[in-house]
Amino acid sequence: MLLVIDVGNTNTVLGVFNGNTLIQDWRIRTIRESTVDEFNLLAKALFVDKKIDLSTIKRTVISSVVPPINSILDTFCTRYLNQKPLWIDPASVKNLMPICYSNPAEVGADRIVNAVAAFERYKTSMIIIDFGTATTFDAISAKGEYLGGAITPGVMISAEALFQRASKLPRVEIFRRPQNVIGKNTIDSIKSGIIYGNGALVDGMVKRMSKEMGTTPKVIATGGLAVLIADASETIEIVDNALTLEGLRIIADQPVFSEGQR
């Protein structure tokens, strides 16, 4: 079986594939101060809970935007899984997708993985929006080229800044959009601004990016808050929260990688 790991600034997502089927996934906090042994204990507990034997993991592929975690995961794989993981970066996927960036090495591994997965699934021009610690917009051409994108502060980062800097505003939990855009109390007004405001941000960015692309791209959202913001957006067509994990599987199954890891 294949273990895929996507390390983000806030959360780390792990998934186990049996062939092309994702049989289990977990979302845990990214803890930069964690040790190899601590990560091993956590991983073992997760696997035992789902009755998955670590010894059945024959290959591991990782994307990470948190360098301090990389050595921990690398050692975990070699010490406890008896294998070297495949690390994803722009150079490792250059044969799968041309990256039209002035410096391809600057593109986050997660963004490239999303792009590879989305193009493999939909085979058309598209804009991928990933709602993570940052909200990223990535444009893919109909030829499967990574054209570039945009980065904005994430939904929760923006909300946290508001709560910290505006002392009279209460901290609110954001689980569902309010019924009305015009809030009738402070809490609903904050929820409206955060949720509908981010929905409008998405729609505005999609409109501008589509104009530059000269196409009508398919708009795909992923990430922890994708469902919530998609409900407030007029342009998001598909929510695919397994996109990054699926992209890691697709890359790992390319002959140049899979043969080297067997």
UniProtKB/Swiss-Prot annotation:
Annotated GO biological process: coenzyme A biosynthetic process
Enzyme Commission code: 2.7.1.33
GO CC terms of this entry: cytoplasm
Entry-linked SUPFAM superfamilies: Actin-like ATPase domain (SSF53067)
Annotated positions binding substrate: 101, 108-111, 186
Main location: cytoplasm
Name of a matching Pfam family: Pan_kinase
Binding site for ATP: 6-13, 133
Record's keyword terms, sorted: ATP-binding, Coenzyme A biosynthesis, Cytoplasm, Kinase, Metal-binding, Nucleotide-binding, Potassium, Transferase
MF terms in GO: ATP binding; metal ion binding; pantothenate kinase activity
Organism: Desulforapulum autotrophicum (strain ATCC 43914 / DSM 3382 / VKM B-1955 / HRM2)
CDD domains (alphabetical): ASKHA_NBD_PanK-III
Keyword Protein biosynthesis on entry: no
Quaternary structure note: Homodimer.
Classification lineage: Bacteria, Pseudomonadati, Thermodesulfobacteriota, Desulfobacteria, Desulfobacterales
Location relative to the cell: Cytoplasm
InterPro entries: ATPase_NBD, Type_III_PanK
Gene3D superfamilies for the chain: 3.30.420.40
Function of the molecule: Catalyzes the phosphorylation of pantothenate (Pan), the first step in CoA biosynthesis.
Textual note on the cofactor: A monovalent cation. Ammonium or potassium.
Family: Belongs to the type III pantothenate kinase family.
Pathway: Cofactor biosynthesis; coenzyme A biosynthesis; CoA from (R)-pantothenate: step 1/5
Name of the protein in question: Type III pantothenate kinase
Residues the record marks as active site: 110
Reported cofactor(s): NH4(+); K(+)
Positions contributing to K(+) binding: 130
Catalytic activity: (R)-pantothenate + ATP = (R)-4'-phosphopantothenate + ADP + H(+)
